[in-house]
Amino acid sequence: YRSSAASDVYKRQHLDGKIPKDNPKFKGKDNWLPEIYQIGVRNPQGMDVSPYNNKIYLTNHGARGGDWFGEAKYGENYGWKILGWGGTNYTGTKIGPKWKPGFSKAIKYWVPSIAASSMVIYKGEEFKEWNGDALITSLRDQSLRKIKFNDDKFISEEIIFKDKIGRIRDIEIQEKTGEIFLITDQGSVWK
């Protein structure tokens, strides 16, 4: 999977550049590129394929607020530039409603913005009780958050820690042990 933030879309193609035959067709958009998988995403940051249900999940930066975590949905539209997900433009003007029918709905929204960055769906031995939960890093409030969810239903959010190591840019899980590694903007790696 490849994403293209500049054009507010997610693109899906094979590593060799070929387009999957089952990519969606958007109604009334016959001239759109065949690799487009989903539209209406403002500023995608993190993406992971769940080892539990094989669905793709992502984090997105809103403008001033309106960050979200949700599922990348085949052929659907998250509504960017029509919807503001609760955020406002940097000038303070309203972007649009948080959500409305006809658009994909995120699992979790953040207003004010946390500047959601990377994310993973946790699978490991180190924190077995977290298996299947989303671990989401943030830049603005420098936090690691755990989101418990079931399909598209938000259950709970826990801030594991905040304001301790700086702006967290990336998260990786050691496959064999489930240990968590965090990478900050300063280039530090934390375990």
Spans of model-derived segments:
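Beta-rich, blade/repeat-based domains predominating
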Residues: 36-55, 111-132, 164-178
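Residue position within the beta-strands of beta-propeller blades
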Residues: 58-59, 136, 182
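Short loop/turn segments immediately following the C-termini of beta-strands
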Residues: 61-63, 139, 185
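Loop/turn-rich, solvent-exposed surfaces of beta-rich toroidal or solenoidal domains
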Residues: 90, 94-153
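Blade-level signature of beta-propeller repeat domains, shared across WD40, Kelch, NHL, RCC1
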Residues: 174-191
